[in-house]
Each structure stands twice: as structure tokens, then as C-alpha cells.
Amino acid sequence: MEVDIQSKKILLKEKVDQIIFWIKKKVLSAKKNGVIFGLSGGLDSAVIAALCQKAFPDNTMALILPCESTNDDINDAMSIVKKYHLSYKNIDLTPIYHQLLSIMDTTFNNRMAKANIKPRLRMIALYYFASIFGYLVVGTGNKSEISVGYFTKYGDGGVDILPLGNILKSEVIEIAQFLEIPQNIISKPPSGGLWENQTDEEEMGFSYKQLDNFLKNGEITDKKTEKLILTMSQSSVHKRNRPPAFKFKK
């Protein structure tokens, strides 16, 4: 048992080292100075914080961008800032979010349309500071959520690089444990923070465990869930691809 645990730690260290090297390579090849990312207080952004700090100890910036966010999420984000000694800015986007809604046509009252403004405002803030400091914007999305389009187009999907983009949620959890991310952050229900008490799994209609099993094996025993996963994946292809461009026939 001890040998298995030690072997797993060695494997995880190799994975972490590969990701850190990849981040460095992407930033240097883009001729940028460092990295910037949004720190929500969730698991994925905590892992990204740890990886980025290891890649660029002196040129990493975290943006805490609450927008109707809970105090717990803000406190969790701050705990990561302190743990990894991150350079950061805490900018409350709630007032500008409400101001924007007040001048829009709100007669439709579409909750999702309103909620998606939040990650898009965060994207604007990230690229503003990225431009000032010459940093790349690092996304926090993982393979599981990307595969079913569980992200906001031109919001949290609007980034320069995705270190976790080919890593399943279950694998991100293992990396988080190896990096000694606080257990309360690892165990809290994943949430995009789009509205009060919103969780990823409730909104998707299935668990990350089911989704990861499907992505690993190509099928799961629960065919209703399998169909839902396939439907979400197919309907979100446009979110994962560049916009199609018209071509004249030759």
C-alpha cells in the first residue's frame, strides 16, 4: 500500500512538472512577461493559482472578481492568495453588473442571459490587466466541463491558454490534493457562481463522476444520462471551435 501511495505521488509530481513547463513554454513563446487568472475560491482556480505561482513566482497575478458572490467564496480565494503569496487585486464587479442590467432591455427576464454577463465582465477585467502587464490570461476550465460546453462563451471561455483543458475533473482533484489545496476548497460543491446556491452538477443534470466515466469509457450504464451528455456535447460544439468563416466557391 505504501509503495502504491509513493508511486502515485511520483506520477502526480511528474504531471505537475509537465504542466508547469508547458505554462512557461506558452508564455515565453508568446513573448509575454507572465500570467494572470481569475481566482474564484473554487477548486480549479486554486489549482491554477498553485501551478502559475510555481511557473512564474514573480510574474503571476490573481484577480478576485466577485459579482454577487458569497463571502465564503471570497474568503476561500483570499486563503489561496495567502497560501501561495500571490500578487492580487480584489475588484467587486457587482455595481457595474447591476448598472449594466439597468440600461439593458430587461423585459425578457432571462436568468441565464443575465448570469452569463458575470463571467464576461470578468473576462474584460482579466484582459485589461493582461494588456497592462504583458501577461497571458490563463483559463481554469477542465476537460470535463469543456467537453459538454459548461462554460460561458467569451466569458470564462475567453482565455489564452488552458493548462487543465485536457485533464478530467477527477484528475484535477488528485492534482489539488498533491498540491495541498485546502480540503474545504477541494470538497465544496463545484459552482460557476452564476446565481445563489447554483451548482455545476445540479445545472448539468449529472455528476462529474458520471461525466468522467463517460469520457474515459465512451459509455455509461445510465443511458438517460449518457444521452444528456451527448446532447450537451453536440449542442456546444460552436463553443469549442473558432467561428466558421464563409468561403467563395472556386
State where each predicted segment sits.
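Conserved G/P- and acidic residue-centered "switch" motifs that form tight phosphate/ATP-binding loops
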Residues: 42
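Catalytic-core regions of hydrolytic enzymes
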Residues: 120, 124
